[in-house]
Amino acid sequence: MPKWLIVLLAIASLAGVIVLEQTREPFPAVTPVMNTQAPTATPPATVPTVPQTASSAVGAPALPLPETTRPQTPSEIPSAPQTPSTAAAPSSVENPWAGLPLAEFLNRAAGELVRLSPETVTFLGLGTELGVRDDHLDPLTAEWEAEYYAIEQAIVDHLATYDLARETAEDRLNAEIYRASLASDLAGRSFTDNGYGVSSYMDSYPTYIEWFLTSLHPLETLENAEDYVARLAEIPARFRELEARLQQSEAIHAVPPRFMLEIAVEQLRATGSQPIEGSGLYATLRDALATIADATEETTRALLGSAEQVIADEVLPSYLELAEFVAAMAARANDDAGVWKQDSGADYYAYCLASQTTTDLSADEIYDLGLAEVERIQTEIRTAAATLGFDSALSMPELFGRLAEETGTSLGEDTIARCQALIDDIVPRVSSAFLRMPTQHLVVVDGGSDIYFSPGTLDGSRPGQFFAPTLVPQPIYGLPTVTYHEAVPGHGFQSAVAYEADIPPYIAGMSFTSFSEGWALYAERLAWEEGAYDENPYGNLGRLQDELFRAVRLVVDPGLHAKRWAYEQAVEYMVNNTGLDEPYVRSEVERYIVTPGQAVTYKVGMLRILDLRERAKAELGDTFSLPEFHDIVLGHGELPLDLLERLIDEYIAEHQG
């Protein structure tokens, strides 16, 4: 998929742990190894000029890939064309990394990549530290993408000059983690037009960019407000670049199903037709200016006037223009749901599975694993439900429908209060399972209709946040599991450990979905093992339903993309086998359509962590320590699963010795 979409997905999904310790040595200023200034974004003269490409700090998860595409060593990664603008520097005069110790090189190279993406700099809260203002959006051009890959290739080429066997174990591991992430990105160069830039799902670029500006762009100073208006002014140019990329994607049949494009058209038209006062882009700035201490009446009026003009004359019309472009695409589209319809669709899906799971599992293997897990978990659910008086012959929809009726629902502030109480209860329960309990602050906030965890910024100005759903009634039996998954001991806990661990910034910023989501699903089970459900058997059924939900994904994702399932077939299978309501399932299947491979990471990662734990238990017997095991898992930041397995094997060998 295009590099801009990888960055978009990583930021928008908030799946990666993007946290660095404030007291660490900052990324050093570096001289770019090549000229990477994109022609599409020219900062004002008063703003430091920065290269406008993407950052691997929030890139796609790492390899291994299937044997047909997986580079085994850095030397096997296809070399970038050796032109003056893309060639790795051949001499110390041209290569500022020459002669650097490994750790310093990695820190400098990673810092350079971070500063190349304005949106990533904002997400990490590194603008002040890097001397980069938050006044640009990442370009979406093929040129921007090519420059990014060239920088990444140069880093891989230089990394290959080090003899890792001579480095410390810590530096060697960090280099392997970083190389894995870069290798995954570079392997994706063959699929730069396969991703979906516009759809009805939340990762659609127009939806993402509004969310990014209204949720992540800092608005605490007048300079922040000026930067916000500058970014608003870039939206029309980004939409024109998006249209060019969509044309390239359509040429290889990389187009979402017609119905998803038709919904996207409605969304774009609604946004473009709204009055200024109803625009979230305008309201965000207006509300923020009311809280900025040095925002006088005059400056407020001037900034709002500028924003109003930009939104009315440029931004909203660009939404309407894009809507007509997408409407024409929809008229040419069909209803096929999977990426199998794309040119090289099978290879693209194999890449998605490998990069997302960091394993070499094939689509068929994942599908068969899913069928087996669905059968196993449904049997466990029926057994547990029978002890509560439920008929074991009930279907999943019937069983969980009755469970919801018996336990009731929560809404609004009640949901927030319940989630906070669950966190207060689980922290002391799981403390004995860890060597270190993080101190980073975590807050439960109003998530509207959404449920997710967002890491805090690097400067501590925004704490980790668990967004609890308040607008949609939530089955009470399911609240414990979602809280443990998103907060403690799941995403919030894992991200806080990474924040406080003594690991380099370029590692703390890595994102491997199979690790983070695998840990969060494992955390649900860990809460059960630590007694969180002992007095809440209904909640335990919610936990099992959640695990079943993730197992069903193992069937549906390859069903759609490898076995040519229709959209309705996927919806029907999921409703019948999870007991989840149909509207929610439809939104889930739409997600799987446009993010191939991501949905399988939860169960794949959880099963790998459990397998490694059982291996360590079997090998170490009475000397096995659960807190030590968890410290190995969490103490190095996010990892590709093959490297995690190696760490556990080394831990076992060390303790046996």
Predicted segments with their positions:
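Sec-dependent N-terminal signal peptides
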Residues: 1-28
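Intrinsically disordered, low-complexity, compositionally biased regions/tails
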Residues: 8, 20, 49, 63, ...
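Ser/Thr-rich, Proline-interspersed low-complexity disordered segments
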Residues: 23-94
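N-terminal maturation segment of proteins
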Residues: 78, 84, 90-657
